[in-house]
Swiss-Prot record:
SUPFAM superfamilies: S-adenosyl-L-methionine-dependent methyltransferases
Gene: rsmG
Family the UniProt entry places it in: Belongs to the methyltransferase superfamily. RNA methyltransferase RsmG family.
A GO term, aspect molecular function: rRNA (guanine-N7-)-methyltransferase activity
Organism: Arthrobacter sp. (strain FB24)
High-level lineage: Bacteria, Bacillati, Actinomycetota, Actinomycetes, Micrococcales
The protein's name in its UniProt record: Ribosomal RNA small subunit methyltransferase G
């Protein structure tokens, strides 16, 4: 079993509530078959809770109830599966092009009994028209200048992108500003989430999209 500190447990209880056991089982999948199949590096196992699962799950605060969320480049389910566990009211579509990752994701979804998750084996750009999400999430996929083109089209003209980023978030926004506006982004901001729960809060770039709204 993966060790969890008192601080991590407190945060996990606050985020996952009565679904904490599901989160613990997910972490065990990451630590075992996830590392065996190359989805998570072995060195990451001691910090799965803080650096990965809690870092991702806390962004549920930024997502409205009942939203359809598309997670681009879902990989090991970060943040997609974290959100599905923390928020059973959400409908999750995990978009992942690599077969071995898709197989692993589906195995975990089945084992945890997550009825609010669909796993799609495809590239994000090929999912346009098949997916019409309210919110699109991503973590460690690519720079925002490229990520905007992979995420915004999945919103069907209106919605939000919530991308987990690092300290360079502001700089990435500056470089991607033109592309974001062209795609229908009307407001882009950096939001720090989980300062009251996490030792290292999560930084996200939030893009509000509305193609029908004219940008000055």
């Amino acid at each position: 079993m993966v060790d969890i500190t008192a601080a991590e447990l407190k945060a996990a209880e606050a985020i996952f509530g009565d679904r904490l056991e599901l989160a613990e089982r997910y972490v065990e999948h990451l630590a075992t078959s996830g590392t065996e199949r190359g989805l998570i590096g072995p060195r990451e196992v001691p910090r799965l809770w803080s650096r990965h699962v809690l870092n991702c799950a806390v962004i549920e605060r930024e997502i409205a109830r009942g939203s359809h969320v598309a997670d681009v480049g879902s990989g090991a389910g970060l943040p997609g599966l974290c959100l599905a566990i923390a928020r059973p009211d959400l409908e999750l579509t995990l978009i992942e092009p690599l077969e071995r990752r898709v197989i692993w994701l589906q195995e975990v979804v089945d084992d945890l009994g997550l009825t609010n998750v669909t796993v799609m084996r495809t590239r994000a750009e090929l999912a346009v028209g098949m997916v019409n999400a309210d919110v699109v999430t991503a973590r460690a996929v690519s720079a925002l200048s490229n990520l905007a083109g992979l995420t915004i089209p999945l919103l069907g003209g209106k919605g939000e992108v919530v991308a987990i980023k690092g300290r360079s978030a502001g700089e990435e926004i500056e470089k991607a500003a033109k592309a974001i506006r062209k795609l229908g982004g009307v407001q882009t901001s950096v939001v720090v989430v989980g300062e009251d729960l996490l030792e290292e809060p999560t930084t996200v770039v939030r893009i509000i999209v509305n193609k029908s709204q004219k940008i000055a």
